[in-house]
Amino acid sequence: MLSIRWDWGQYGDLQLGDYEKARLWIERIEEMSQEGGFLEGGARGQGGEARARNSVPLLKARYIVETEEWMVLPVTEESSNNELLATALSAAHTGDQQALRDAETSLRERSSGEGEGTGIMANEVSALLHAGMGHADVAKRFMDEAVETIEAMAPPRGSASPIKPVYELYGEILLDLGEPEEAVEKFEKSLERMPNRPRSLLGLGRASAMVGDRDKALEAYTNLTRVWAGRDSFDGYKEAMSYIHSTENN
């Protein structure tokens, strides 16, 4: 249960924009796994240390994805699937095509021998790669495959899985491809599965504003400012407030 607590705890702090506390979760788990922070024997003995060590890459990868503080990590055989996805997203946003290709290759190789979760992440990364190359139809085909897989699954009850939700990423890709109408649908679906998720609210606000749906954009941006209350320094918060103020003057 301890691993669930730090998993959900960090995720919750990230959604609220408390990035300092989210980093603290990582530091604490690293200290506990490296400096004998677990009791000898029992559930919190060696097993607890192993769970802590295995959780660190997940927490670090999630931090990169949620904060969008992009970091391209080396792609190696030891890279976890979550690290590969975080690296692929970072590479896509920073223009590192080689790192993006390397991450895609690794996830594709693993997807044939692992569960559906790896296949979903592989499709997400393939979509990022082809979207960046201007292959819109190919990118959407990969995302459609990812959607088909997750639709057979129940919505997450805790933290997002994969760490970059499929519908959210699909919406962001569609925005980049200049298809805001379709993006609106994807962000709405993302919010059905994970209500009030800030990155999906931000995407819905942007897409709705682009298609001229003022009411929907205003609702999404307003909800975002509530989730990120007090996060005045966030670019997304500033964007939301700017839109809200613009509607007050019209």
Would you name each region that the model predicts?
Residues 13-32, 92, 105-108, 147, ...:
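TPR/TPR-like (Sel1-like) alpha-helical repeat modules
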Residues 8, 59, 82, 86-90, ...:
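"A position-specific structural signal for the A-helix of alpha-solenoid helical repeats
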Residues 27-38, 105-112, 144-155, 185, ...:
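Amphipathic alpha-helical segments of tetratricopeptide repeats
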